[in-house]
Swiss-Prot record:
Protein's recorded name: Precorrin-6Y C(5,15)-methyltransferase [decarboxylating]
EC number in record: 2.1.1.132
Gene Ontology BP annotations: cobalamin biosynthetic process; methylation
Family: Belongs to the precorrin methyltransferase family.
Keyword Cytoplasm attributed: no
InterPro entries on file: 4pyrrol_Mease, 4pyrrol_Methylase_sf, 4pyrrole_Mease_sub1, CbiE, Cbl_synth_CobL, Cbl_synth_MTase_CbiT, Cobalamin_biosynth_MTase, SAM-dependent_MTases_sf
A Pfam family reported for this protein in Swiss-Prot or TrEMBL: TP_methylase
Alphabetical UniProt keywords: Cobalamin biosynthesis, Methyltransferase, S-adenosyl-L-methionine, Transferase
Source organism: Pseudomonas aeruginosa (strain ATCC 15692 / DSM 22644 / CIP 104116 / JCM 14847 / LMG 12228 / 1C / PRS 101 / PAO1)
Recorded catalytic activity of this chain's protein: precorrin-6B + 2 S-adenosyl-L-methionine = precorrin-8X + 2 S-adenosyl-L-homocysteine + CO2 + 3 H(+)
Enzyme kind, highest EC tier: transferase
One MF annotation (Gene Ontology) recorded for this entry: protein methyltransferase activity
Keyword Lyase: no
Length: 415
């Protein structure tokens, strides 16, 4: 065990609330009084009294950490809203700097203050931020009976949230807009999404949502295998039952990256990302119309950060980051596709390919004989009317090849 670095951190993050300097603790005040340079948003810097003599700098527009990091090692204070490590600049800095270079002095977050005002148990609430993020990210969080705390991007966010809820059939949901939490201008506005009439709130606001589904609400469960009707497509869709099996075989885990090669309408990548907020996916699709379907579906189903690559495999794969899993829903007979996918797959990763035609089945059988893996055939039948009776209507059988790339061997220990 090594001792911690004794060098004091050069960067101090001070969380500040709407109550400004008087609301800070002793450590935070001392840090600001001793600082030679303070960086923050103009609104936050204006909360400091004249006794703080440090040079003050606002963040550049558009926002960037580069000017701050260019002075790495020079003692600096950064002002942040509430808890800097909760949807704040602290989280961004922590991804680029080791913990030994940071000292964080948090204040109560607006999420904590909102939970206190509403009497909600914070650990039972879904918390998310729309600050510089697409509104569509909210779609994956809307479920009957669920409570949400949403950090707004600006004063237009509450009305936009109400419109989204209405479009999903959640007009009965109760909204509470909490403005300037913790400050002298604090205000609360309540109403139903279906009756929301406030055109614009204060820019600094948080929206609390109690989700209530109406009779026509669109239900989007978290398990794989969403209804086929949830997708806009031209027929190039991995059908619901096969999709559920495919996702189970791909086995998404937090933080993992998927390539969806020949993505069609994007269903596999979308449901991969819905498995956990940190899951990532890249959809590779050459057809222009299907690319539009992917853009629509990723927003409608709450994963707007799904990355779409317009192009054909294998050429479109060459510059992409290495994936933890790959799904090939079409194109296994195209020259070089399987070879490139297998080469780029991380050690220990999973590759799953589906085939319908005899030609594509032959390719999968050849790969299975060379590399092993699981070869499975799925047959799905649905009851359909036939005259005055019902009969089973068989869908085209699907052949699945599941391969796992051997993990990299650890070097032997020295004797």
């Amino acid at each position: 065990m090594s001792s911690a670095d004794s060098t004091p951190p050069w960067l101090t993050l001070v969380g500040i609330g709407e109550d400004g300097y008087p609301g800070l603790g002793k450590q935070a005040r001392r840090a600001l009084l001793q600082a030679s340079r303070i960086v923050g948003a103009a609104r936050q810097l204006e909360l400091l009294p004249p006794c703080i003599g440090a040079a003050r700098e606002t963040w550049p527009t558009p926002f960037s950490l580069e000017p701050l990091l260019a002075r790495r090692g020079q003692p600096t204070c950064v002002l942040a809203s509430g808890d800097p490590m909760l949807f704040g600049v602290g989280a961004s800095l922590a991804r680029q700097l080791p913990a030994t270079e940071l000292r964080v002095l948090p204040a109560p977050s607006s999420l904590s203050l909102a939970a206190a005002r509403l009497g909600w148990a914070l650990q039972e609430v879904a918390c998310l931020s729309l600050v510089a993020r697409p509104l569509a990210a909210l779609q994956a969080q809307v479920h009957d009976g669920r409570r949400l705390l949403v950090l707004s991007n600006d004063g237009d966010s509450p009305a936009a949230i109400a419109r989204l809820l209405n479009a999903r059939g959640f007009g009965a949901s109760r909204l509470s807009v909490l403005e300037h939490l913790g400050g002298p201008l604090e205000r609360r506005l309540d109403g139903l999404a279906g009756d929301w009439s406030l055109p614009r709130a204060a820019d600094l606001n948080l929206v609390a949502v109690e989700c209530r589904a109406g009779a026509g609400a669109v239900r989007l469960p978290l398990t794989p295998g969403l209804a086929d009707e949830a997708y806009r497509h031209d027929g190039q869709l991995t059908k619901r039952d096969v999709r559920a099996v495919t996702l189970a075989r791909l086995a998404p885990c937090p933080g993992e990256l998927l390539w969806d090669v020949g993505a069609g309408c994007g269903s596999i990548g979308i449901e991969w990302m819905r498995a956990h907020p940190s899951c990532r996916a890249i959809a590779i699709e050459a057809n222009d119309e299907r690319q539009e379907h992917i853009r629509h579906n990723r927003d409608a189903l709450g994963v707007p950060t799904l990355h779409l690559v317009a192009g054909s495999a294998p050429e479109a794969l060459l510059e992409l980051p290495e994936p933890d899993a790959i799904f090939i829903g079409g194109g296994v007979t195209a020259e070089g596709v399987l070879e490139t996918c297998w080469e780029r797959l991380r050690p220990g990763g999973r590759l799953l390919a589906n085939a319908v035609t005899l030609q594509s089945e032959r390719v999968l059988l050849d790969w299975q004989q060379r590399l092993g893996g699981d070869l499975t055939r799925l047959g799905v039948a649905h009851a359909r009317p036939l005259g005055g009776f019902d009969t089973w209507r068989q869908a085209l059988p699907i052949t699945l090849l599941e391969l796992r790339k051997p993990a990299a061997r650890k070097p032997p220990r020295d004797a």
